[in-house]
From Swiss-Prot:
SMART domains reported in the protein's UniProt record: Iso_dh
Record-given protein name: Cytosolic isocitrate dehydrogenase [NADP]
Keywords: Cytoplasm, Magnesium, Manganese, Metal-binding, NADP, Oxidoreductase, Plant defense, Stress response, Tricarboxylic acid cycle
Bound cofactor: record note: Binds 1 Mg(2+) or Mn(2+) ion per subunit.
GO BP terms, alphabetized: defense response to bacterium; isocitrate metabolic process; NADP metabolic process; response to zinc ion; tricarboxylic acid cycle
EC number, UniProt record: 1.1.1.42
Record GO cellular component, one term: plasmodesma
Catalytic activity: D-threo-isocitrate + NADP(+) = 2-oxoglutarate + CO2 + NADPH
Matches recorded under InterPro entries: IsoCit/isopropylmalate_DH_CS, Isocitrate_DH_NADP, IsoPropMal-DH-like_dom
Principal place of residence: cytoplasm
Residues involved in substrate binding: T79, S96, P97, N98, G99, T100, I101, R102, R111, R134
Location(s), subcellular: Cytoplasm, Cytosol
Amino acid sequence: MAFEKIKVANPIVEMDGDEMTRVIWKSIKDKLITPFVELDIKYFDLGLPHRDATDDKVTIESAEATKKYNVAIKCATITPDEGRVTEFGLKQMWRSPNGTIRNILNGTVFREPIICKNVPKLVPGWTKPICIGRHAFGDQYRATDAVIKGPGKLTMTFEGKDGKTETEVFTFTGEGGVAMAMYNTDESIRAFADASMNTAYEKKWPLYLSTKNTILKKYDGRFKDIFQEVYEASWKSKYDAAGIWYEHRLIDDMVAYALKSEGGYVWACKNYDGDVQSDFLAQGFGSLGLMTSVLVCPDGKTIEAEAAHGTVTRHFRVHQKGGETSTNSIASIFAWTRGLAHRAKLDDNAKLLDFTEKLEAACVGTVESGKMTKDLALIIHGSKLSRDTYLNTEEFIDAVAAELKERLNA
């Protein structure tokens, strides 16, 4: 029986990327998406050569289009360093596309593991996923820091419309040292709170916010207070009805709890904590190649889904020479499924939602049936790894496509 393509009423934004992930991106689209779904795709090429050719305007345009259409699906991209500037002959060292997009969308990045029963976890107690929400604005990432030479007094000045307030920070008496001033805004913290509450409510999981408000009484205290305000005003009754809860915890207490918990909650982290803890979680669950990443905007309606890993340069160099690669495409496939699932929810498209669930199940089912890429086979087999224990890049995508067709025809 021929599969009837699923019609999608509204467009999605596609952001193409670089290197090996660009190669698998095309394969995923050709083998797992377009044969089954009739999509209006607003395409933006965020590959480094095209970003350079457009003076990075394409990145800004893609983010603006995301605001308009509410759903973006993004391939991994290169953030250039000096070496890349030389390699590509770039006009300048362009900023991280992810950073640019996050600043325009003012979103919170949620990362969550994809669990396959046969891939061993470093933390075996984690039987359910832990979704980590990273506030992707301000703090250390927008800070001003300085090296202090010699003795002197460090002060902090704020000039408001009612005049100037000066706060004494420290008096250096010796050789000097270092200093830093950082900030956040009530608007951004409120948006972070709303995105976190919304994500936990959608998943019907409890929500925890971690801070160090015992030390940073005013700074972290503001996060704690705003989260509590947002919860009481907009979410408490919904959470009570769903049998879930919101709680603030100290970061050290939360890290200890995370390690001994079974999972099954959303963890809202400040910017730096989220940067660190999301990698700790990815490794604990088994692999960065099994991690989804979704940027959720404060309107609760706009998202950008992507893989949580880079462009897999090492594999791309082999691919360029015509060699065989075994690159894990699962996180990139899940970028498509999470984006399309959100489109399905916005459009009330049950068929599309069912398709995304079956494609995710086909990915996990393929791995659990023993068909996987080399990185996962290495976690399972270790030193006993041999060529017959894994598939190459295209073979794996073909295996997922076969599994998907079976599930769609069942």
